[in-house]
Amino acid sequence: MRRKILVIDDNTTQCKVIKELFESCGYSVVALDSPEEALYLLEWKEFDVIITDLSMPWMNGVEFCRRLRNTRPETLIYALSGYIYKFDRNELLEAGFDGIFSKPIRIDLLKDAIEEDLKKSRMVG
């Protein structure tokens, strides 16, 4: 079974790069540029992993994560930001993020974290 990843970033180039990299690793990936669109999609579609930018114009990643945690506590959620220093790490973890990564992304580190967390969730679930 292919694992499903949802990528949310208002930078469409960034979305495309992440999508292509994870697809090349065998994941099924949907990329969106709007957290509102993602919340709508999540009403009827399930994902194993969500990767979201923190700084988006319509809704920031922290608000998105908090809203999602109310309905999808089991979904792995990772934060990305080119301005990670602007965010309080404890606030991000309290919001429910499973991992926090700075841009430019080291895709190998992100992929390793996701695969490790998916293994852990399979053992627990």
Where in the sequence are the language-model features?
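Acidic catalytic/metal-coordinating carboxylates
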Residues: D33-E37, N60-F64
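Receiver (REC) domain active-site loop signature in two-component systems and cognate sites
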Residues: M56
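Active-site beta3 strand of CheY-like receiver
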Residues: K45-I51
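C-terminal output helix
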Residues: I105-I114
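Alpha4 helix (beta4-alpha4-beta5 surface) of REC/receiver domains from two-component response regulators
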Residues: E63, I84-I100, D112
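Charged docking surfaces used in two-component/phosphorelay signaling
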Residues: K16-S24
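Short hydrophobic/Thr-rich beta-strand motif most characteristic of the beta2 strand and flanking loop
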Residues: G26-D33, L41
